[in-house]
Amino acid sequence: MTLWEKVKNLPDSPGVYLYKDEKGEVIYVGKAKNLKNRVRSYFQPPEKLLPKTRVMMEKARDIEVIITSTEVEALILEQNLIKRYRPRYNILLKDDKSYPYLKITGEEFPRLLITRRVVNDGGRYFGPYPDAGALNETYKLLRSIFKFRTCTPTIFAQKKRPCLNFHIKKCSAPCAGEISREEYFKEIEMVVDFLEGRGENLIKKLKKEMAIASDNLEFERAAKLRDQILALEKILAKQKISRGQRNADVVVVANRENLGVGLIFVIRQGNLLGQKVYTFTGEMETGELLNQVLVTHYGEAKEVPVEIILSTRENLDEEFLNSWFELKFGKKPKFTVPKRGEKFELLKMALENVNFTLDEKIKLNEKKQLLNEKALMDLKEALNLPVVPRRIEGYDISHLAGTGTVASMVVFIDGEPVKGKYRRFAIRSAANDDYTAMFEAVLRRFKKYLALQEEGGADGSFEELPDLVLIDGGKGQLNAAMDALKETNLLGKFTVIALAKEQEEIFLPGKKDSLLLTQDREGLKLLQRVRDEAHRFARGYQEKKRVKTLASLLEQVEGIGPKRRKQLLNKFGSIKNLREATVEEITAVPGITREIAERLKELLEME
């Protein structure tokens, strides 16, 4: 599905959109009152866009959206996602408008400030707050309750006597020693408790302290605590109980047409930090899918929230999940299925997002299936095949300067890779001869097929014949594969071709001239995907084998333990590089003495 096709399917809801580049990295985060209208505005003739926006859109390859209930939700989520991803074009494109935060400075006697800039300066930040007016009101009340200082560091350093703020009971005058650092920090800790949503707990704590002060006849302190409690209760009475005062995850699923999607909203300290999406294929009941999503997500997580909000508990394996959570985290979350209130609103928002994501993925799958079918029919016609090539196998050879030669076999069915059927072969014959290596790989693959036919048994990789075999290379590699098939008496049972990378020439057996398909042909694009996947798979195996060989050699050298072995592997990467390195270059690795380096060089010369 193209970017524009995705945009056409966007809803008219408020939400956040994330542009991604070809690597899948988030390059821009924006918010919208109407997602469809806002995102469409980027698709104008380039000359109508700002230069920076034009550059950003040239890089954009994909878009993800998170639907929110209100524009305010979108504002908060946008800020959190920008902090999380640090997208490069937000730094360039974001307008000067930003949302205010409360900041507790990292000074000896901290201040509480309202700021629109978040920097790594040792301070603690709370927010963002989309309603600046309400924030100013809260700030004034907090200042009247806790009496923290507001003066600049320069003025604070010069003060020897309390200023007017102390006399009108708006500052505790730490500059003049009217309050100890310990007592001042207790006040700041209470501010933190309040800002982190623990206002009720703070009031309970203050009431206990007030009772103790009263019992000890400390009436002045008890009166101060009483005033703080009354002011805090006034603030809390005005506040709507919000999800901002809890850590929770909302976990929802949707499934249709052999496709399942799980979505998690992560809410921490009052902020919706974003969503995590999981996709599953195959027939699955809703309860089974929900269990799978929970185990998959929390299997990777470092923490579990106090509460997990669900749309249903039907078929939820709570006994197993509770045991599993206890074992992994030492505690179990509370599962809730809200029917009304704020939690229900959150749940509705998550369900809207998961259904939108599922619809989008189904459309993408349908488009992919159509393109794959078009590519397969194109190949049948272009290569004059007797059947549509439902099963295509791709082969490639990889080695490093003639050593550690490996071959890969990848399998595509109906145009899609089936990774469970991939296989790799460590080449035993002439290591630095690509033709001999290709001959061996193809011969071994089809001998396995014949053995299965004769002896019975099952092997998803080898028990079926392909409709088409694609060899990475030119005529030489193609001829080697054909020779291998002659030995197995399978020649003519299916079609074999080679694809040479430089000109993307297709070589066919017995044909003098190569075949060239235009770059826009879906058939050629599919062949390129198969070839590139075979190449990637071979290189990955060859790399693992090379590192394993080097690690094995390093184990033989006295004085090189696991830590030094890892350092040498990271620095040199191969026996060839290590052999070419000087003793001085080897001793540059921490912990490698000249004596150890010389022993290693001696062993390398014997190899």
UniProtKB/Swiss-Prot annotation:
SMART domains documented for this protein: GIYc, HhH1
All residue ranges annotated as the UVR domain in the record: 200-235
GO cellular component: cytoplasm; excinuclease repair complex
GO biological process assignments: nucleotide-excision repair; SOS response
Domain named GIY-YIG: residues: 12-91
Pfam families named in the record: GIY-YIG, HHH_5, UVR, UvrC_RNaseH, UvrC_RNaseH_dom
Keyword DNA repair: yes
GO molecular function per UniProt: DNA binding; excinuclease ABC activity
Xref: Gene3D superfamilies: 5' to 3' exonuclease, C-terminal subdomain, GIY-YIG endonuclease, UVR domain, UvrC, RNAse H endonuclease domain
Keyword rRNA-binding in annotation: no
Compartment(s) where it occurs, according to its Swiss-Prot or TrEMBL record: Cytoplasm
Keywords on record: Cytoplasm, DNA damage, DNA excision, DNA repair, Excision nuclease, SOS response
Self-association and partners: Interacts with UvrB in an incision complex.
Listed NCBIfam families: PRK00558.1-5 (NF001824), uvrC (TIGR00194)
Family (UniProt): Belongs to the UvrC family.
HAMAP family for this protein: UvrC
Function: The UvrABC repair system catalyzes the recognition and processing of DNA lesions. UvrC both incises the 5' and 3' sides of the lesion. The N-terminal half is responsible for the 3' incision and the C-terminal half is responsible for the 5' incision.
Protein name as catalogued: UvrABC system protein C
Taxonomic lineage from the root: Bacteria, Bacillati, Bacillota, Clostridia, Thermoanaerobacterales
